[in-house]
Amino acid sequence: MLLSGKSLKHDFIRFVSATMASQVVFSLYSMVDGLMVSIGVNEYAMSAVNLAIPFTNALFSIAVLFAVGSSTLITIFIAQEKRREANALFSQNFATLLTLGAVITALVLLFLEPFAYLLGADEITLDYVKQYILGIAPFSVCYLVSYNLEVLVKTDGYPRYALFTVIGGCLTNCVLDYIAIFHLDMGVFGAAVATGISQLVTCISYFVHFFSKKCTFRLCKFRFDPHLYARILPIGLSDGVTELCTGLMIFLFNRTVLKCIGTDGVVTYTVIAYVTTIVINLMVGISQGSQPLASYHYGKEDHTGCQKLLRYALTTVCIFAPALFLLVFFFAPQIVRTYLSHAGDELIAYSIGAFRRYSVSYLLLGFNIVIGGFMTAIERPVPAICISVGRGLALQSAVLLLLAAIFGGDAVWYTPIFSEALCLVMSLLFLRSYRRQTDMQA
């Protein structure tokens, strides 16, 4: 693992800043698709892209599951100078993702229309959803491999290389989106293909690194060892569940809003979901950027270093959380009008109010994500999974359904505020338990 040798704080800033930037750029993939589809087609096509997001979230969650678990274990192996084991794990994980991607592509294309209905498509959005899935599904392997290699490049000590690769992929997506939608008139299908090709471009860039001499670990012949996943999957489960829960909550929110408010409510939530994805990914960037460092110091049994990294991460959240909330609160009208340029004044006004209420949750969610990610880095999967499932699905879905049933449709916009607050209580309890155990070992 390539460290600067200057200070722990310097390494933290170097890793986290690059990871946060790459996470923001990665979230722009769906935002660019949605924005260009809204302008180039219509707002219902944009809603269809939002309906398809749970599918891409599912792909991303699988990628995160294997990437975080394997990178954590590889980092520990490297800290323990077990280079051969690190190479074998890297190679096995890569082969597994190729197989999973091929299977997912085949199943989705075989059951395309039922899958579109499962995502929440109706008579208005069915064709749009099918077109988007048809364009993105063949690139499932690229989705899985791309993020896995990105995390491993950062684990190898080259976060800037990963950042520039992600930026290059995003720029490719923007250019191809524009060409496909506005020049080739390919609509939603063109937006999906553009996104898939950009993922392929990032994969190729990462391969250049892993076949270079500067790479610490590389592909090699290996004997498949299923027992490795007994360690990989529990470690990566927390972050994987965090990503999967994002997709599941978008799915559940779409269903609930459609039932309680109607189609305009889904359009409103689509705008909120795009911006919230950026906020969440920024916090995930803080978490995942510090994880390789925390795992490295944990492997060396440096508990003081681990606690410093946690303090740095939480301090970063304290800076970014209120800044993001204020930014969204005051610029909500401009953001909403950008996406709903063809909508009526009533829908725009309603969306601005809903957006501002929802954005209060931005003050809390980062703390839960960082604490859960830290538990992952130090091989405490049970607290990490509890936090991830709690904030991402269990508490949020329960609060959503309860508020909708008691107070009606408009109350759903308060859902994340209450669910994140409840989860924060649980996170702080787990954190207190960890600190007590660490103090006893000192």
Regions from the PLM with identified roles:
Residues 28-47, 116-123, 179-186, 247-278, ...:
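Helix-terminus/linker motif at the lipid-water interface of multi-pass membrane proteins
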Residues 43-54, 129, 133, 192, ...:
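Small-residue hotspots at the loop-to-helix junctions and early N-terminal turns
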Residues 14-33, 135, 146, 169, ...:
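Transmembrane helical elements of multi-pass membrane transporters/channels
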Residues 1-19, 74-141, 183-237, 294-361, ...:
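Short alpha-helical transmembrane segments in multi-pass integral membrane proteins
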Residues 58-61, 105, 173-177, 203-207, ...:
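Hydrophobic transmembrane alpha-helices of multi-pass small-molecule transporters
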Residues 46-106, 143-162, 268-332, 365-387:
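Small-residue-rich hydrophobic transmembrane alpha-helices
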Residues 3-41, 54-69, 73, 98-105, ...:
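N-terminal transmembrane alpha-helices
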Residues 136-154, 162-170, 191-206, 284-287, ...:
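Short runs within selected transmembrane alpha-helices of multi-pass transporters and secretion channels
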